[in-house]
């Protein structure tokens, strides 16, 4: 079930409260020291469902700044599923660790920046980005699928490593 209001989220963790408080600032919200967290670092955990709600907006959520969502150093828990979501501002999740693949199939975004992050896959078939997709120094232990993606900016993979899943592994 998708969250529709902030009330649906329930009790917010400290990193979530901090991000919510800075949502309309246009600046980066930094979890901890902003470096890449270890898996299971609950002090820096932010739920993917909460991020989705912030990106899509809700009546009881502060307005997202025009620069988009800017987060550094979080452990993103759960599946951040933005499939078919349109007109999203920029998404910056730098030096973040994801425990599930990021799903952007048929999404429409301004830009995507995942620099320094670690994730188990990126499903972005038919993604439409007005700007670039920046994956500098990213570690992906799984598939990257950008088939049919339309990028008005650059695709940057400098310093990244991808360990593709075996062909017997089902797609995300």
For each predicted feature, which ranges?
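N-terminal leader/targeting and pre-domain segments
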Residues: 1-172
């Amino acid at each position: 079930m998708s969250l529709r209001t902030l009330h649906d989220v329930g009790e917010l963790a400290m990193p979530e409260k901090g991000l919510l408080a800075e949502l309309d600032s246009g600046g980066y919200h930094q979890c901890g020291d902003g470096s890449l967290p270890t898996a299971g670092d609950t002090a820096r955990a932010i739920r993917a469902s909460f991020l989705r709600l912030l990106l899509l907006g809700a009546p009881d959520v502060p307005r997202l700044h025009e620069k988009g969502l800017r987060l550094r150093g979080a452990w993103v828990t759960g599946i951040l599923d933005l499939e078919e979501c349109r007109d999203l501002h920029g998404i910056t999740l730098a030096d973040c660790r994801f425990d599930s693949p990021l799903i952007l199939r048929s999404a429409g975004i301004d830009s995507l920046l995942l620099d320094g992050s670690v994730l188990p896959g990126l499903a972005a078939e038919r993604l439409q980005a007005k700007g670039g997709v920046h994956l500098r120094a990213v570690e992906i232990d799984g598939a990257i699928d950008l088939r049919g993606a339309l990028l008005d900016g650059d695709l940057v993979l400098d310093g990244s490593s991808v360990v593709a899943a075996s062909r017997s592994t089902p797609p995300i």
